Swiss-Prot record:
It comes from the Bacteria. Binds 1 zinc ion per subunit. Keywords: Carbohydrate metabolism, Cytoplasm, Isomerase, Metal-binding, Zinc. It comes from Aromatoleum aromaticum (strain DSM 19018 / LMG 30748 / EbN1). One of its GO terms (molecular function) is zinc ion binding. It is an enzyme of class 5 (isomerase). Pfam families: SIS_2 (PF13580). Transmembrane segments: none annotated. This is Phosphoheptose isomerase. PANTHER family: DNAA INITIATOR-ASSOCIATING PROTEIN DIAA, SEDOHEPTULOSE 7-PHOSPHATE ISOMERASE / DNAA INITIATOR-ASSOCIATING FACTOR FOR REPLICATION INITIATION. HAMAP family: GmhA. The gene is gmhA.
Length: 198
């Protein structure tokens, strides 16, 4: 096995998928930034959820908003619903794992808030339940998926934003999700701070 060749293919494949995603996602990402800014400027917050690598992405995004991304600015309200082990295990034990995010959305979400729902397959049952709870709370939904968008893609309304990565491999989808989250953070900072192109 030629590891150098295999590694090179990974980089090339990742770059190709990112360029393909640029065509599909640039405008929807800009729309998602505007929705998030609208919520944050009206004392709203962003609740983020996902499983596995997507849980890490939810935490990464919330940390960038609460702390900072690349520029100094005031903290922004964002909560990753993946971090409170007592709450997560209590809900999973007493009810069902499909409810671990939706119960938190019902407790913490308010009209005008935004749910950032991350699922590479678009079929994660607990993320789907979180979207249903967000509907009840009159929240907008920004969904990051891959493949064909799965069940989540079919659930979204006109007021929501679907950021579906045009790829099948989970690793490639996750790589584009991370870049997308960084684009969201950068867009939020630029609109909040009035930063011109650099």
């Amino acid at each position: 096995m030629d590891l150098i060749h295999r590694i090179s293919r990974q980089f090339e494949d990742s770059a190709r998928i990112k360029l393909e995603a640029l065509e599909a996602l640039a405008a929807p990402i800009a729309g998602a930034v505007e929705i998030m800014i609208g919520s944050l400027l009206n004392n709203g917050k962003i609740l983020a959820c996902g499983n596995g690598g997507s849980a890490a992405d939810a935490q990464h995004f919330a940390a960038e908003l609460v702390n900072r991304f690349e520029m100094e600015r005031p903290p922004l309200a964002a909560i990753a619903l993946t971090t409170d082990t007592s709450t997560l295990t209590s809900i999973a034990n007493d009810y069902d794992f499909t409810q671990v995010f939706s119960k938190q959305v019902r407790a913490l979400g308010h009209p005008g808030d935004v749910l950032l729902a991350i699922s590479t397959s678009g079929n994660s049952p607990n993320v789907i339940e979180a979207i249903a709870a967000a509907r009840e709370r009159e929240m907008r939904v920004i969904a990051l998926t891959g493949n064909d968008g799965g069940q989540i893609g079919a659930l979204l309304d006109d007021g929501d934003v679907h950021l579906c990565v045009p790829a099948q491999r989970t690793a490639r989808i996750q790589e584009v999700h991370l870049l997308t989250l960084h684009c969201l953070c950068d867009g939020i900072d630029c609109l909040l701070l009035g930063v011109e192109d650099q």
